[in-house]
């Protein structure tokens, strides 16, 4: 990007941006929730739309001069509805967390009981963690995975639902590598007359391309972020049945937000447009191929994968048999140029600041053009670094840098 003005006005900040640019360029990015946006997305984000206040919704604003940003928001909403075949879309949430908060506030009262996936089993902070607003404002109870299969225990979920009769069941996850059976969860919701909400932030790209079954036909509400597999700007969105549209919109504004970020909404429109193209489907198919190959190679090196493998874009790895914690593995791999995050595993025995595992994903490296052969090399680099962690790993770091040079960010720019 052109930083001519920033170079003159704030070289100190520009230096920080340049260092981050270099880190992204020469590191293998395996954090499952991260991706690289297109230059088009960044151009929209950096546009003068950031100057415009637009409280309210298209054609019902509290400010004048909104006729063109109305067009932008309408375009984003229509593209999102088309992408997921949804009845209503709200593109104003600043984040996935705020999208979730708005759904809760739209139909529930403070203190209502909600059933969500346990954070340590793969859920999310906003699905009831006691340190999060969700756990503080609502009476969350949790379901998890089966100890043997490490996949969602739907029998346990149903049993807990029947015993506690929550007002809402939340599904979706931040560290779950398998297909989620939304139809089965809908049946449980119907049995207890509960709302069904799905947080598809991680798998939105897989859903959009038909690789993962869509929650939209089953759920009353579907929330997502726009910056993970959707490869857009950092932000959130909500899909819902038309009958909940007014309640959801009111929960966002004036409920929990003021003016929407019109430059971000424009960038969301760009990414939704990109996701509607055929090449995006090919990209998502390659993401899954890459993840499966990476998983199999890691298994060949003796790594234990939670649930034995993956159906989506991520892998959850138990490092116990490698005699290294998630925290130490994250630091070690970062030192050679592989970025991962420490992660709790089901039935975790260590602190969430230490963890027994790491979570990795392939959306970002697949965006760069990495394919199956590169996945085999990544598995080798990870295994070698962990097995030889007391040795000098400078040669591994150099090999990683050379691979990154072969697949530059925005190579077609």
UniProtKB/Swiss-Prot annotation:
CDD domains: SHMT (cd00378). Its main location: cytoplasm. One of its GO terms (biological process) is glycine biosynthetic process from serine. Its EC number is 2.1.2.1. Keywords: Amino-acid biosynthesis, Cytoplasm, One-carbon metabolism, Pyridoxal phosphate, Transferase. It catalyses: (6R)-5,10-methylene-5,6,7,8-tetrahydrofolate + glycine + H2O = (6S)-5,6,7,8-tetrahydrofolate + L-serine. Pfam families: SHMT. The keyword Amino-acid biosynthesis applies. It is found in: Cytoplasm. InterPro entries: PyrdxlP-dep_Trfase, PyrdxlP-dep_Trfase_major, PyrdxlP-dep_Trfase_small, Ser_HO-MeTrfase, Ser_HO-MeTrfase-like, Ser_HO-MeTrfase_PLP_BS, SHMT-like_dom. Pathway: One-carbon metabolism; tetrahydrofolate interconversion; Amino-acid biosynthesis; glycine biosynthesis; glycine from L-serine: step 1/1. The record marks 227 as: Plays an important role in substrate specificity. The keyword Cytoplasm applies. Signal peptide: none annotated. (6S)-5,6,7,8-tetrahydrofolate binds at residues 119, 123-125, 351-353. Its cofactor is pyridoxal 5'-phosphate. PROSITE patterns: SHMT. The modification N6-(pyridoxal phosphate)lysine is found at residue 228. Belongs to the SHMT family. Homodimer. Catalyzes the reversible interconversion of serine and glycine with tetrahydrofolate (THF) serving as the one-carbon carrier. This reaction serves as the major source of one-carbon groups required for the biosynthesis of purines, thymidylate, methionine, and other important biomolecules. Also exhibits THF-independent aldolase activity toward beta-hydroxyamino acids, producing glycine and aldehydes, via a retro-aldol mechanism. This is Serine hydroxymethyltransferase.
């Amino acid at each position: 990007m052109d930083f001519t003005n920033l170079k003159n006005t704030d070289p100190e900040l520009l230096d920080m941006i340049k260092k981050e640019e270099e880190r992204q360029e020469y590191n293998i990015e395996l954090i499952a929730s991260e991706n690289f946006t297109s230059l088009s997305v960044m151009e929209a984000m950096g546009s003068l739309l950031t100057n415009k206040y637009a409280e309210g919704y298209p054609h019902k604003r509290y400010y004048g001069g909104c006729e063109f940003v109305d067009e932008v928001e309408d375009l984003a909403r229509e593209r999102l509805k088309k992408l997921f075949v949804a009845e209503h879309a709200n593109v104003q949430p600043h984040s996935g967390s705020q999208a979730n908060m708005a759904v809760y506030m739209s139909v529930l009262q403070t203190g209502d009981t909600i059933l969500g996936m346990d954070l340590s089993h793969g859920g999310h902070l906003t699905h009831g963690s006691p340190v999060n607003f969700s756990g503080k404002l609502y009476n969350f109870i949790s379901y998890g995975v089966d100890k043997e299969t490490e996949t969602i225990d739907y029998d346990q979920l149903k049993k807990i639902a029947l015993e506690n009769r929550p007002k809402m069941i939340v599904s979706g996850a931040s560290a779950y590598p398998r297909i989620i059976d939304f139809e089965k969860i809908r049946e449980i919701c119907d049995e207890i007359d509960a709302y069904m909400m799905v947080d598809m932030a991680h798998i939105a790209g897989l859903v959009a391309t038909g690789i993962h079954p869509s929650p939209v036909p089953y759920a009353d509400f579907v929330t997502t972020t726009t910056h993970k597999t959707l490869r857009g700007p950092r932000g959130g969105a909500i899909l819902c049945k038309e009958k909940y549209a007014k309640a959801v919109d009111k929960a966002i504004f004036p409920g929990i937000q003021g003016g929407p970020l019109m430059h971000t909404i424009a960038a969301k429109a760009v990414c939704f447009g990109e996701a509607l193209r055929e090449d995006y489907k090919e990209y998502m198919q390659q993401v899954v191929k890459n993840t499966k190959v990476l998983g199999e190679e890691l298994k060949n090196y003796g790594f234990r994968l939670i649930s034995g493998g993956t159906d989506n874009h991520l892998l959850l790895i138990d490092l116990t048999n490698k005699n290294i914690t998630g925290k130490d593995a994250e630091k070690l791999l970062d030192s050679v140029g592989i970025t991962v995050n420490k992660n709790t595993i089901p039935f975790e025995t260590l602190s969430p600041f230490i963890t027994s595992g790491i979570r990795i994903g392939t959306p970002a490296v697949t965006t760069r053009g990495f394919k199956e052969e590169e996945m085999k090399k990544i598995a080798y680099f990870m295994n070698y670094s962990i097995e030889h962690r007391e040795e000098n790993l400078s040669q591994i770091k150099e090999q990683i840098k050379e691979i990154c040079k072969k697949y530059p960010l925005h190579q077609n720019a």
